[in-house]
Amino acid sequence: MEVETDKKKLIESFRLHEKDTGSAVVQVALLTQKIKRLTAHLQNNRKDHSSRRGLLRMVNRRRKLLEYLNRTEPEKYREMLSRLSLRK
């Protein structure tokens, strides 16, 4: 249940309107949370190659969403980078 409550709080803090659950901003925030969790898992389980592959897919998907956000809404892109402590 902890993951679900974290996810709901994250969606509430990044959503653009009342029913927003799938905008690029929310997707980037959720992917960042999953990436952090999976990175911690992989530090303890170095031989978990399937999780490493999943991590690489998530990082690539987040990168593409951030590129889209930068292309369409540069202000929100910069805000996302600062709020999530991402470097670009």
Swiss-Prot record:
One of its GO terms (biological process) is translation. It comes from the Bacteria. The keyword Ribonucleoprotein applies. The keyword Flavoprotein does not apply. SUPFAM superfamilies: S15/NS1 RNA-binding domain. It holds the Pfam family Ribosomal_S15. Keywords: Ribonucleoprotein, Ribosomal protein, RNA-binding, rRNA-binding. GO terms for cellular component: cytoplasm; ribonucleoprotein complex; ribosome. Gene3D superfamilies: 6.10.250.3130, S15/NS1, RNA-binding. Belongs to the universal ribosomal protein uS15 family. One of the primary rRNA binding proteins, it binds directly to 16S rRNA where it helps nucleate assembly of the platform of the 30S subunit by binding and bridging several RNA helices of the 16S rRNA. Part of the 30S ribosomal subunit. Forms a bridge to the 50S subunit in the 70S ribosome, contacting the 23S rRNA. This is Small ribosomal subunit protein uS15. It comes from Methylacidiphilum infernorum (isolate V4).
